[in-house]
Design a protein with these regions (language model features):
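Glycine-rich loop(s) and the adjacent beta-strand/alpha-helix scaffold that form part
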Residues: 158, 205-313
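Conserved Rossmann-like nucleotide-cofactor binding loop
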Residues: 17, 40, 331
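A short alpha-helix-loop-beta-strand transition element characteristic
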Residues: 44, 83-88, 107-119, 301-309, ...
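An anion/pyrophosphate-binding glycine-rich loop and adjacent beta-alpha core
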Residues: 292, 301-399
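Conserved redox-cofactor binding core of oxidoreductases
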Residues: 93-246, 266-267
Length: 399
């Protein structure tokens, strides 16, 4: 095992949060090392690249929307329901518009082109949209609806990748050092203080490094769409890493843990989220809970680990929201214009995770006509299934 030189700050995890922490530390004059078990980006790079921001951002104003920190707070406190302190929510709302300015300084780009319809994700014609429950009952009773979903300007589903690359470029331009394929397995603790980390890494000169990168890229794409195949490809990459990884350690004045969740850890899912074991994971294989466990090993506290979510969005096309969602008993699930995750949670909690959307012929025809203008290719594929074999038709509700 070789002992590396010390850094002011070591960050474990190089997604959007880790990159932001690295940038702030570098701006403060710190010497920064970032370790990531992948090649950087994490779930942030796979995401839609949407930042939730409000309180009067330039892009809200460009779209003719009125918002304020108080209005944003009145909405968000309904969403978090006490799981985040009022003080933290208030601070987030008050600094939200400033966050967009900060992101733009790092290279992120936004537009005030507002999507005029409810959608799970906007097309390339729109980069601002109602990304939550802002317009839905009962949320709109306490806060004036305002669109706050700011999507990074990029083509199709590349917004998340473009968003992270802007942060990566900014961090590396400020002198932040990055060591990929590095798995931290222990924190170095002396006299009750964390003073470094121990990790294994596959160095750039290691045999099979380029093949590992190719396999990881394929596994990352398949892991969310066809998990069994993605797992097999990842197993090959994992074998390469295990055969070539070497032990290292590094000391630091401060250690920041910035890893993902645990959706790719079957044991943790079974322990904390019974009933979700068979849900297809959304994220990367790095979301295995290892960084959470590192924090716990140093005395960190965790809470709400049982709060896993599974989604079924009903739009686009937006006309589908004019239908009625019902559970197996025929009872209505909830108002259809709720955010997809919110509506799905009610369906899980009260209807066993099963539901149906009932439409008449007029809504069906209207929705079909909206497919071309309201969908990106991945949404179009789902609509193609729905409008071909993914539905049942009858003259009456009785069938």
């Amino acid at each position: 095992m070789s002992v590396e030189s010390s850094y002011d700050v070591v960050i474990v995890g190089f997604g959007a949060a880790g990159a932001a922490a690295a940038i702030e530390a570098a701006d403060a004059g710190a010497r920064v090392l970032v370790l990531d078990r992948g090649y950087g980006g994490g779930a942030s790079a796979l995401s839609g690249g949407v930042v939730y921001a409000g309180g009067g951002t330039p892009y809200q104003e460009a779209a003719g929307l009125k918002d304020s920190p108080d209005n944003m707070y009145n909405y968000l406190r309904q969403e978090v329901r006490g799981m985040v302190s009022d003080a933290t929510v208030r601070r987030f709302c008050e600094t939200s518009a400033e966050m967009i300015t900060w992101l733009e300084r790092q290279g992120a780009r936004y537009r005030g082109t507002l999507a005029p319809y409810k959608t799970s994700y906007p097309t390339d014609a729109h980069y601002l949209y109602y990304s939550g429950n802002e317009k839905a009952w009962p949320y709109k009773l306490e806060a004036e609806p305002a669109a706050r979903g700011h999507r990074m300007v990029a083509k199709g589903m590349s917004s998340g990748h473009a968003f992270f690359e802007a942060l990566r470029t900014s961090a590396e331009g400020k002198g932040v050092e990055f060591e990929p394929l590095s798995r931290v397995h222990d924190l170095i603790i002396e006299d009750g203080a964390v003073v470094g980390v121990r990790y294994r890494t596959m160095e750039s000169s290691a045999p099979g490094r380029r093949r590992h990168q190719r396999l990881s890229a394929v596994a990352g794409k398949l892991g969310n769409w066809v998990p069994p195949i993605g797992a097999r490809v990842n197993a090959r990459a994992e074998a390469l890493w295990q055969a070539n990884a070497v032990e290292k350690s590094v000391r630091a004045t401060s250690v920041v843990l910035s890893g993902g969740g645990f959706v790719f850890n079957p044991e943790m899912k079974a322990k904390y989220d019974k009933g979700f074991e068979d849900i297809s994971p959304l994220g990367t294989v790095s979301d295995d809970g290892s960084v959470i466990n590192l924090g716990v090993s140093a005395g960190g506290a965790v809470d709400h680990l049982e709060r896993m979510t599974a989604w079924r969005f009903m739009s686009p096309p937006s006309a589908l929201l004019e239908g009625v969602s019902v559970g197996p008993s025929g009872a209505r699930v909830a108002n259809e214009d709720l955010y997809g995750a919110t509506h799905s949670q009610v369906m899980i909690d009260q209807h066993g995770g099963r539901g149906f959307l009932v439409l008449d012929a007029n809504i069906w025809t209207k929705a079909r006509r909206q497919i071309k203008t309201q969908t990106l290719p991945f949404q179009r594929a789902m609509a193609a299934y729905l409008f071909s074999v993914g539905h049942k038709k009858a003259a009456t509700l009785e069938g």
